[in-house]
Amino acid sequence: MKLNKYLFLLSAVLLLPINSAPEGAFTTLHVKAMDVAKYVDFMKKNTQPFEAIGSDVAGVCVTRSGNQYPGEMFVWNAYGSIEDAFIASQKYDPMTPNKQFEKLRKVKYGVTWKPVKEFELRPGYERLWRLKLNDWRAFAKKMEELESALKAAGHDMRLGVFYPLGGGTEVFHLRAVTDTASQSGKVADEYFAGASYGKIWDSAFQYVDEIVSETVEECE
């Protein structure tokens, strides 16, 4: 399996028009890479671990701003269900000593994620907020409203809200994804200039108790 081989198929699943949370789940393995470029290149050339766990789609996100430590990044895998994601976590233990990987990265932790709003899986330039929410359903609804308003304003920004499962101290994730940094910056500029969709963003924060952190990532 090549990274992102089944991207279109999984995107179709996550975009099904249903009232409950969309299907699918993700896992992330957070690491400290000794050399980010070398680690990513190694994974692209050695896809056996991804094939072994049976993920539908796989990729990486590299933290570019707001880092908690040098070389901060994670490897993500997408599945058709939480069940599949949980089963996959039993097939591969990243904590097991591996001489090849030990030279390239240090494992921090792993998490399973459930998307709680429709989300088009098209990685790119991504702003990530780690949030403590008091009503995740209401917050997700606000993000649906905001995404529609952004599209009406001519912006191609995909918003994802993700519920952590077995994540230790992890909290909810909000991702705002664009194809380029320029597109993301334009949305932010318009917000501070008083764009009407900014009111939806501001209103959504009644459901946020705390912004734990905010980072910028480049994903593929």
Model-predicted regions and their roles:
Residues N4-L16:
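Sec-dependent N-terminal signal peptides
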Residues N19-E220:
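Short S/T/G/P-rich N-terminal loop/turn motif that feeds into the first structured element of a domain
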